[in-house]
Curated annotation (Swiss-Prot):
It catalyses: geranylgeranyl diphosphate + L-cysteinyl-[protein] = S-geranylgeranyl-L-cysteinyl-[protein] + diphosphate. It is an enzyme of class 2 (transferase). This is Geranylgeranyl transferase type-2 subunit beta. Pfam families: Prenyltrans. Belongs to the protein prenyltransferase subunit beta family. GO terms for molecular function: Rab geranylgeranyltransferase activity; small GTPase binding; zinc ion binding. It comes from Candida albicans. The lineage of its organism: Eukaryota, Fungi, Dikarya, Ascomycota, Saccharomycotina. Binds 1 zinc ion per subunit. Catalyzes the transfer of a geranyl-geranyl moiety from geranyl-geranyl pyrophosphate to proteins having the C-terminal -XCC or -XCXC, where both cysteines may become modified. Acts on YPT1 and SEC4.
Length: 341
């Protein structure tokens, strides 16, 4: 039974405002725009994902998006950077691949052999990603050596999109992930670090891609994990937090609910009050979503608010169904090969 008060005002979803907001963000040239160069490729993915989920992908010019992504190719590393002339990184590489997959399932733009004597871009991307895996199964984000479970998910997802995920990579990567499982039922960045909802998604999502979810069946790990996830719902607001004793944040509508969806336990939380919390985070005047009601909007929270609504009831909003493993529409991910021998 929902905890939504009977006199709660019904809040409508204003799609046109959010489409306008995203388009403006993707073409913005403010001071804040230049301060966030390091997130530009991620921001493009957030905007494109929100638009395609709302069935409004045509709001951005497809060729302009693809041209920008290819400007971010770093020929030195064989990967994508977050901005033209930035070094390649695993995070921006996944975002680039996700957007390219949305527009071109076959990734034909990566098959050009003319620009580099070192092979085509697809081959070089696979070499870059696989070269970041360490002996313990973890992945670095780039050559500078930072390691955490985000990069495991990012690498595994990228290789899946490239149809290059092998058993040898999956076996060691999944072993590292399970080392990051905590006594409280969550996952952390590295072994022994604090449990966090976003890290739970990266670990559960990676295990799903690698067909390794059965590793959670040992020693009641799945039961503990589901309990930890359901405890993230904060009353009376209905939103999720990322850790115990923290405020709810609309982005966890994705990180928590996607993990529960992968584990087939989405209905173990109150979806009605969660939906209401998400809708209260809208800026109904200018569009976009914020982390909490009344705060400043941004494209990151907008993307994951819309993705959360799709998980709750995509038909109600006229959205595309979203894949909880990849955070992309099912119509795109249904053709992915999650693991190859």
């Amino acid at each position: 039974m929902s905890n939504l008060p009977p006199d709660e005002k019904v809040i409508l979803f204003d799609k046109s405002k959010h489409v306008q907001y995203i388009v403006e963000q993707e073409s913005h040239r403010s001071f804040e725009y230049w301060l966030s160069e390091h997130l530009r490729m991620n921001g493009l993915y957030w905007g494109v994902t929100a638009l395609i989920t709302m069935n409004e992908l045509s709001a951005l010019a497809q060729q302009d998006v693809i041209d920008y992504i290819m400007l971010c190719w770093d020929d030195k590393t064989g990967a994508f950077g977050s901005f033209p002339k930035h070094d390649g990184h695993i995070l921006s590489t996944l975002s680039a691949l996700q957007v390219l997959k949305i527009y071109d399932q076959e990734l034909t733009v990566l098959n050009d052999n003319n620009e580099s004597s070192n092979g085509n871009k697809r081959e070089r991307l696979i070499k870059f990603i696989t070269g970041l895996q360490l002996p313990d199964g973890s992945f670095q984000g780039d050559k500078y050596g930072e390691v955490d479970t985000r990069f495991v998910y990012t690498a595994v997802s990228s290789l899946s999109l490239l149809n290059a995920l092998t058993d040898s990579i999956a076996d060691t990567a999944s072993a590292f992930i399970m080392q990051c499982f905590n006594f409280d039922g969550g996952f952390g960045l590295i072994p022994g670090s604090e449990s966090h909802a976003a890290q739970v998604f990266t670990c559960v999502g990676a295990l799903a891609i690698m067909n390794k979810l059965d590793l959670l069946d040992v020693e009641n790990k799945k039961v503990k994990l589901i309990d930890w996830l359901t405890e993230r719902q904060v009353l009376p607001s209905g939103g999720f937090n990322g850790r115990p004793e923290k405020l709810p944040d609309v982005c966890y509508s994705w990180w928590v609910l996607s993990s529960l969806s992968i584990l087939k336990r989405k209905n173990w939380v109150d979806l009605k009050i969660l939906e209401n919390f998400i809708l209260t985070c809208q800026d109904l005047e200018n569009g976009g979503f914020s982390d909490r009601p009344g705060n400043q909007t941004d494209v990151y929270h907008t993307c994951f608010a819309i993705a959360g609504l799709s998980l709750i009831d995509y038909k109600k909003y006229g959205f595309k169904e979203i894949d909880p493993v990849y955070c992309m529409p099912v119509e795109v991910t249904s053709k992915f090969v999650r693991r190859s021998a």
